[in-house]
Amino acid sequence: MDKINRRNFIEKALLYNGSIVLGGFWFAPTLENLFFQSASDYYLPIQPNNPAIARYEKKCKGCRECIAVCKDVQKVYGNYKASKTHHVCIHCGACISHCTYGAMSEKYNWQDVIQAIDDPSKIVIASISPSVPAGIGDYFGIPSGSYLSEDITGACRNLGFDYVLDTNFSADLTIMEEAHELQKRIQGKSNMPQFTSCCPAWVKYIEIFYPSLVNHLSTTRSPIGMQGAMVKTYFAQKKGIDPHNIVHVAIAPCTAKKYEITREELMTNGMRSTDIEITTDELAIMLKSRNIELSARKEPFDQFMGTASGAGKLFGTTGGVMSAAIRTAHFNITGKNPPADLLELKQIQGLEGLKTATVNIGGTALKVAVCYEMRNAQVLLDQVASGSCEYDFIEVMACKGGCIGGAGQPTSDINNLEARIKALNTVDSQAATRFCHENPEIISIYKDFIGKPGSTVSEQYLHTHFTDKSSLLEPILAQMQLEPAV
């Protein structure tokens, strides 16, 4: 059954005589029900203030699918005593993807976007992640794996966005910083292996369950984190726009990005770098709610912060970040672009949950690992914690297949995932440049604004830090300041 029917696509967006309900009618239990009763044996007790996920009580059948995937695949539920702690959530949305009754959903923020577009004092900017053009066609009867970037750009302009940018631009920026950081770590033999840090669900998982390993995370912001920072600084300066009047909207396949954009570590000059995140689902809902055809108008991205390499587009698929990083790391270390075998790096492509390879860069053998889902990541984390890990660089994504299988995407069965992977690989192979360091806009932004990877400006706007969040596992009552009895 397709996801529109399975998750009651229209019903969950337009409720009660067509009036739009922002955020849905998520489950709002009492404190007693949420933390202390055995009802959580039948469903995940999602808290009302969860920024990414909502639960619709009336639709829940108690099938336990949400618990099963959270416990067995993402290794969250069951790693703490649900009867005595917060409901711990990494916002990956696996529970949404596995709920067959539409009882779990992303928190809706698309009406906030409509409100911003309708405000004449605001400049509303959309940034499109690479998995969105590879997935949205499923909602409109277009074959899976069709890459529809120009369709989405035109549709966003019909919705009223002032600018439509390519988040792949900042994927290239991420690789410039991450490859530089990897080279420094290899040379200094410090905090190895290096973990990728562009998946916020994966980052939060480490912060909660493996806080002693947070120093292994790359300090580079995610592409969306960098995109927002550059929109509010570099883009605003070049366009002569007051950044306080900008509403930056990330359109992504990911529910965890709704959480990520709230992290204080990603603020830019006292402002949120990204003001709103909506999923592929929500973009489709917006278009349908305003009777806008997806493919009625085809236009390219705005060219300023709208140009990306093929490597940047690979961020949407498992192994893509690793492939892109290896290409630029090879150039940084040897001064030459990599040979064909490293350009493709087929050993880390595909839908196996854990893949490994050894790559030769300038006479140095670099061992890399790529995985998705926390059950696979946990194997590597335990190796790192015990000192037995043989890898130098590890990429982790929370969702099956990477971002293309995100919880905000249409149905992600094997056929759809493979079609989307093929689409992104094709876009990469046909790109004008396949190397982040050759993107002319990336060259310009370093010349005009950043300076070089690892510079003071880079550290301020393109890097972040991580914190120990293991306190979330402590009993809820120990964290509450109860008023003394009178």
Regions found by a protein language model. Name each.
Residues 14, 26, 51-52:
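Intrinsic disorder/low-complexity detector
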Residues 13, 57, 197:
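Conserved residues at beta->alpha junctions
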Residues 21-31:
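Hydrophobic membrane-targeting signal helices
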Residues 6-10, 34-37, 106-486:
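Iron-sulfur-associated redox domains of electron-transfer enzymes in respiratory
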Residues 18, 22-23, 330:
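Charged, amphipathic alpha-helical interaction segments
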Residues 29, 34-46, 52-90, 94-112:
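Iron-sulfur cluster-binding cysteine motifs and their immediate structural context
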Residues 1-20:
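N-terminal secretory signal peptides and thylakoid transit peptides that target proteins
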